[in-house]
Amino acid sequence: MSITYSAISFSGFSPKSVPFAIHSVTRRQFLNPNTFYRFGFSPSLQGSSIEFSLQLNSRVVLSKERRSLPLVVRNDRPQNEDLPKQYTRREKKPFPVPIVDLRRAARERVKNNKDKPKRPLPPPKNGMVVKSLVPLAYKVYNARIRLINNLHRLMKVVRVNACGWCNEIHVGPYGHPFKSCKGPNTSQRKGLHEWTNSVIEDVIVPLEAYHLFDRLGKRIRHDERFSIPRVPAVVELCIQGGVEIPEFPAKRRRKPIIRIGKSEFVDADETELPDPEPQPPPVPLLTELPVSEITPPSSEEETVSLAEETLQAWEEMRAGAKKLMRMYRVRVCGYCPEVHVGPTGHKAQNCGAFKHQQRNGQHGWQSAVLDDLIPPRYVWHVPDVNGPPMQRELRSFYGQAPAVVEICAQAGAVVPEHYRATMRLEVGIPSSVKEAEMVV
């Protein structure tokens, strides 16, 4: 019996035919794990989702001839994946949906609604809160507090380095050797970083937005930019989603608004309604721990458990915020990181990005994505914390991950499946530069 290797295809690559033969392979030998290495595959691919399919040829052969079986190997999950593109200061962020598709959908919507009675606006467009998303808003708020409190404790046992000249950070006992510093006097240091201690704001980007008492009210003017408080963008999204915080009150309507124009409305009369009774929150709100109460984990088991809880809080916050963004619109400037939680952006002329003079400092508002609201700080993934240091010549073999994920991974947490491709956990790293030059 001979098996002919017909094609091997991974996600994003077209199949290629490379014929070779394996003689006298029985079913038991074929299912043996050692056969995986005799096919010429890397040992790192053994844990991947690889599908083997054997196809018999339809032609009849003589009794003395051996029948050839084409072997097709397919991988549903990519072995490695590039990070999202990082745009320079001179580039504008692309629209999540192309503007041509938006215009086409708008024309189709006007055509379908022609000569039809207007439907009542659903929440939150009618000024009311989506009641089914209120528990989710509380869950996202508490997940953010748990994430911050746990990171304070983990950063006492997992070293996080920050460059003193730029905003780059590195998770590990010492900084990486790559020449990627873009701060002042970088030419004198030849692009090398000067690593110092980091704080929690280096890991979680402190992205703030204006707090709106009425999300359907008038837009914030330029002269009001200092009189309106600013809160973390995720917190503002949770407040508009139904979270009650005494320091940041919000207007809660009990009747839908009455539209009198495209951009004009009046509030419905609520005088005949009884006074609302104060209701307890679905879950109690957590608070951030003071600095004096932050203690490192006492044992290795506690460190691993804390890392798992931190990673779970990170995933809950991102997944819940993504669901809230589907109902409560979030706007982002296409030129700078400014975020506004609301149906339309504010009018504050504080954009200092590329060619802001031509726009008189006004922001170019567009729909935001999850990474605009919760930007992940990508850092280099250290394959072995206790092993040899990272080499500058092997930079293309190392992967990257969000700083929170890398901290939890070095603390002992299991890396989620959707981060393994960018971290390149299944890519073999050469031990030396000479071995890397031998890689085809």
UniProtKB/Swiss-Prot annotation:
Residues 106-126 are annotated as: Disordered. It is found in: Plastid, Chloroplast. The keyword Transit peptide applies. GO terms for cellular component: chloroplast. PROSITE patterns: APO. Residues 1-62 form a transit peptide. Residues 162-247, 332-417 form the APO domain. InterPro entries: APO_dom (IPR023342). It comes from the Eukaryota. Keywords: Chloroplast, Plastid, Repeat, Transit peptide. Residues 106-115 have a biased composition (Basic and acidic residues). GO terms for molecular function: RNA binding. The keyword Repeat applies. Pfam families: APO_RNA-bind. Belongs to the APO family. The APO repeats may provide ligands for 4Fe-4S centers. May be involved in the stable assembly of several 4Fe-4S cluster-containing complexes of chloroplasts. This is APO protein 2, chloroplastic.
